[in-house]
Design a protein with these regions (language model features):
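Sequence signature of WD/YWTD-type beta-propeller architectures
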Residues: 1-113, 119, 138-154, 165
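Aromatic- and Gly/Pro-enriched helix-to-coil junctions and flexible linker segments
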Residues: 21, 29-34, 43, 66-71, ...
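Short, solvent-exposed loop/turn and secondary-structure capping segments
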Residues: 40, 86-87, 129-131, 140-141, ...
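Short, polar loop/linker segments at the starts of domains and inter-domain junctions
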Residues: 67-69, 91-93, 231-235, 253, ...
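GGW-centered surface loops in extracellular recognition modules
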Residues: 369-403
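A short glycine-rich, aromatic-capped structural motif
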Residues: 390-457, 480-483, 597, 662
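Functional-site microenvironments in short loops/helix caps that host divalent-cation chemistry
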Residues: 410, 414-415, 462, 466-474, ...
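Short, structured beta-strand segments at or near domain termini in extracellular proteins/domains
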Residues: 652-662
Length: 662
């Protein structure tokens, strides 16, 4: 006799079932119950699109600190992934570019309250970039989302926490029908350098950059043995971007804004009077936002090995995607070919020689007693009651200040970039205190303990660390906005009773020059800076790395010439790859360290036209950062060099230096 019994903790035994000559293996108790309500299918196989809803794009970590109203639209692109036994490594599409094809799907508008609703292709890996008024990506979505046919996919904001819940509020987008994609001119297609960027170069650049003379060649049509175009190889070194594999944390908004790229800064400052159209600017921004790719296609092989012998991979992928993903297959090769035909129909491009800019009328200004040397500085400081001040901002955390005397000098330079002139006589009416070093991570964390300067990007792939540390206590703080820096100064002022703030452009340049009328306090543009400051030098070659846990490449490595692309002054060795803390270099005659390099520094001045006038009523949406950094060549790190960034922009190589005003 075999039975099934229910036994409780009190040793009560209840027989549920008995049978003679039979046994029960893995019995399951069942009872009659009412069928529960089923969740209706949310997929509508008769549709080819999904609906995407974002309640508030400004919610979440992705757009932290970005003012409401900045996001005007979303740029959508889809990924097309690699094929079997096809060259598709991280450097196939470009140098420090990306792994996959990026197909431009189009843009959709964002409502005033940050909400957005739109339709996009279903069964398609889609990535989203929020754009500002200029068509620049404020943030990069380095993953993707896939909607099923007819599904409504929603999120709260930009990179919101997975535990965050939606805010119970009515938004503009929820009261509207979903927006349709505004397709790119010429249709959906992969972004390729030859068809997107090269036409800009053909019109605006190759009249000069034609392979003749000193200007590097920007003509299209020439490829090296790896398939990289000559114009691409010559242009991409001047673009700041992350690369195929980078730090996985959410990026700072505008981390790779085009204004952090030398190429864009050069053009914005009027490079030989070259003028781009709005469309060309947006295309250039798009290229940078996509990590500056070259190819944008795969040379997928027809397979020769069993069991797939004879398959055309591109054709076969489309067939299978159409069959199993509700017709979502993509013929990206045809899209590229169709756009090439579209461009041909626009007619040949005529290179435009820029109009010669009006000659600069240099006005020689002289100031009595300037320039001056170290002996004069000693005389000036001898009139001050104190020349050094130490401020303890937290137990054991001190800031050393040096006295900067009052005086008059010629601000700006005709040897500099166009925004550095006309020059002006500027008088610093009152002496002030300036920190001898840039504000450090340790000091900044006194007020903002959660701030992390994180890391400097590492090239190549297969990283085992996030990059080169930038968050050591003694290193200068970076990725702080002008607003952050001013708030830091404000809170320290409240705490210490001192008037701590940022310098004006005039105060900064006066302090940096320390009596010099040259490009640097130690000489002209060609002076050896090895012991003076941390700039883009011979050590910049060490950014070219290779292998798992990438280490500096050997010169014999075939990739060496491709990855030593960062502009640099190889004749000088300053001994450091990235920013460093402490007094690693010589101080200028005022006792200030690293004024020209290490990291650039915020000032409290608006980025307005010269000649400099402290009383000007002209304003700007940008603030000025002064000096250069470990990644800048001397020509972009002089005492008169100006860089313009949004006051809420946290820049990868910009920190700040405090002053105290009496």
């Amino acid at each position: 006799m075999w039975g099934l019994y229910l036994v409780d903790v009190y040793d009560n035994v209840t027989c549920l079932m008995q049978a003679e000559g039979e046994g029960y293996i893995c019995p399951i108790l069942v009872r009659k119950t009412k069928t529960p309500p089923s969740i209706p299918d949310r997929v509508k196989l008769n549709e080819k699109e999904a609906t995407f809803f974002i309640q508030d794009i400004y919610e979440g970590e992705g757009l932290k600190g970005i003012p409401r109203g900045t996001v005007k639209s979303l740029r959508l692109h889809a990924y097309e992934y690699a094929y079997v036994k096809t060259r598709s490594d991280h450097n196939w599409h470009g140098i420090q570019s990306g792994w996959d094809i990026k197909r431009m799907l189009g843009t959709v508008p964002v409502e005033e309250d940050g909400s957005v609703i739109f339709k996009a292709p279903a069964n398609t890996p889609i990535s989203i970039q929020p754009l500002d008024k200029d068509g620049v990506a404020i943030q990069w979505m380095r993953s993707w989302v896939t909607g099923q046919p007819g599904e409504v996919v929603s999120c709260i904001g930009c990179h919101e926490d997975q535990n965050q819940i939606a805010i119970p509020k009515r938004v503009i987008a929820s009261q509207k029908a979903p927006s349709a994609l505004t397709l790119p001119e010429g249709g959906t297609r992969s972004f390729t350098f030859d068809l997107e960027v090269q036409p800009i170069l053909d019109r605006a650049c190759i009249a000069c950059h034609n392979g003749e003379g000193k200007a590097f060649d920007l003509r299209g049509g020439k490829k090296d043995k790896l398939g990289y175009g000559t114009s691409y190889l010559n242009l991409h070194p001047y673009v700041h971007r992350q690369g195929g594999e980078g730090d996985m944390v959410v990026l700072q908004p505008y981390e790779y804004h085009p204004n952090t790229s030398e190429l864009v800064r050069l053009l914005k400052k009027g490079h030989h009077n070259v003028k781009l159209t709005d469309k060309e600017w947006k295309t250039l921004y798009n290229w940078i936002d996509y990590n500056a790719p070259d190819k944008g296609y795969f040379n997928a092989n027809v397979l020769t090995d069993l069991p797939y012998k004879g398959f055309d991979q591109i054709k076969r992928r489309k067939e299978l995607t159409d069959k199993y993903a509700n017709g979502a297959g993509v013929d990206w090769k045809k899209e590229i070919a169709d756009y090439a035909d579209y461009l041909k129909k626009q007619g040949p491009i005529t290179p435009v020689m820029p109009e010669k800019a009006a000659p600069v009328k240099e006005k020689t200004l002289k100031v009595k007693g300037w320039p001056f040397g170290a002996d004069r500085i000693k005389e000036m400081l001898a009139k001050e009651k104190e020349t050094r001040k130490v401020v303890e901002i937290a137990p054991g955390v001190k800031v050393n200040f040096v006295r900067i005397p009052a005086g008059e000098f010629v601000m700006g330079s005709y040897r500099g970039e166009p925004d550095a002139y006309p020059t002006a006589k500027v008088k610093i009416d009152k002496a002030f205190w300036m920190a001898e070093l840039e504000t450090t991570n340790e000091q900044f964390n006194v007020v903002f303990p959660d701030h992390d300067s994180r890391f400097v990007d590492q090239q190549w792939k297969d990283h085992v660390v996030q990059g080169y540390p930038a968050n050591k206590p003694e290193q200068p703080v970076i990725r702080v906005s002008y607003n952050d820096a001013m708030e830091f100064c404000r809170k320290l002022s409240e705490k210490t009773g001192l008037k701590i703030t940022l310098p004006t452009e005039a105060q900064w340049e006066w302090a940096c020059r320390a009596g010099s009328d040259q490009d640097f306090w130690y000489g002209d543009m060609h002076a050896d800076f090895g012991k003076k400051d941390n700039l883009a030098d011979k050590t910049t070659l060490l950014f070219a790395v290779y292998g798992v846990d990438p280490q500096p490449m050997a010169k014999t490595n075939p990739w060496y010439k491709y990855y030593t692309f960062l502009p640099k002054e190889e004749s000088v060795d300053d001994g450091n790859l990235v920013q460093v803390g402490g007094k690693a270099y010589e101080a200028n005659p005022f006792g200030l360290y690293s004024m020209h390099g290490n990291v650039a520094e915020w000032t409290r001045s608006d980025y307005v036209s010269y000649p400099y006038n402290e009383k000007t009523k002209e304003t700007s949406e940008y603030k000025v950062a002064r000096g250069g950094s470990y990644i800048d060549r001397p020509k972009y790190a002089a005492s008169h060099t100006r860089k313009a960034y949004y006051p809420y922009q946290r820049v990868f190589n910009v920190g700040f230096r405090m002053i105290i005003e009496d």
